[in-house]
Design a protein with these regions (language model features):
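A charge-rich, low-complexity, intrinsically flexible signal that marks solvent-exposed coils, linkers
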Residues: 1-90
Length: 90
């Protein structure tokens, strides 16, 4: 992990209920909105839409504190702009 990646991911804690290797195995070496746990891939328009949908489910958001959810949503919004994807505030 580069120092830039560490800085970007320092706002999210490692979750005990997740195996980060699973996300990397499933999606490959892609950008994640939660790079600590390799959750919410945001490398394609389809993944951006799915990430936005999932983080806005209360049960998924409840696994993070409010600051972490804001960080994840911010990363998804940036990826949406990059991939020209329109998302609506939930």
């Amino acid at each position: 992990m580069t120092s830039h990646e560490k800085q970007k991911s320092s706002q999210i804690d490692r979750r005990d209920d997740v195996r980060p290797n699973e996300g990397e195995h499933k999606y490959g070496d892609v950008e994640f909105a939660d790079p600590v746990n390799n959750k919410y891939p945001i490398d394609t328009p389809e993944h951006v839409r799915a990430a936005w949908s999932y983080i806005n489910h209360k049960d998924n958001a409840a696994k993070y504190d409010a600051d972490e959810v804001r960080t994840i949503k911010s990363r998804i919004k940036r990826a949406a702009k990059k991939h020209d994807v329109e998302i609506e505030e939930a």
